[in-house]
């Protein structure tokens, strides 16, 4: 049995759905929200690589490197904000972040 494009797309759809379920089922914990967003982004990247490999074009694979760079910066900034929020408010619960309003 060979692995076709449909297998990669199904796996990407499953990973994307897990990320969406992670966002909808747990809206309180900021770490799980960030992890779910990153999982969704990685599912999209896997689809880019699968399509570019299947069609023999390397543009999709190069585009994935740019997306991963932006995702790494997003994760670093998100975790830095998370650390600051935990230091100031002693919580990472999203519902308790209403104290930031002016």
Curated annotation (Swiss-Prot):
It catalyses: a quinone + NADH + 5 H(+)(in) = a quinol + NAD(+) + 4 H(+)(out). GO terms for biological process: ATP synthesis coupled electron transport. GO terms for cellular component: NADH dehydrogenase complex; plasma membrane. Keywords: Cell inner membrane, Cell membrane, Membrane, NAD, Quinone, Translocase, Transmembrane, Transmembrane helix, Transport, Ubiquinone. The keyword Cell inner membrane applies. Its main location: membrane. It is an enzyme of class 7 (translocase). Disulfide bonds: none annotated. Belongs to the complex I subunit 4L family. This is NADH-quinone oxidoreductase subunit K.
């Amino acid at each position: 049995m060979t692995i076709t494009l449909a297998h990669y797309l199904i796996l990407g759809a499953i990973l994307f759905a897990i990320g969406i379920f992670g966002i909808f089922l747990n809206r309180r914990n900021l770490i799980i929200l960030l992890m779910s967003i990153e999982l969704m982004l990685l599912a999209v990247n896997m689809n880019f690589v699968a399509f570019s490999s299947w069609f023999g074009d390397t543009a999709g694979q190069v585009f994935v490197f740019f997306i991963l760079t932006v995702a790494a910066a997003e994760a670093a900034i998100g975790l830095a904000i998370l650390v600051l929020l935990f230091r100031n408010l002693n919580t990472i619960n999203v519902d308790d972040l209403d104290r930031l309003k002016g």
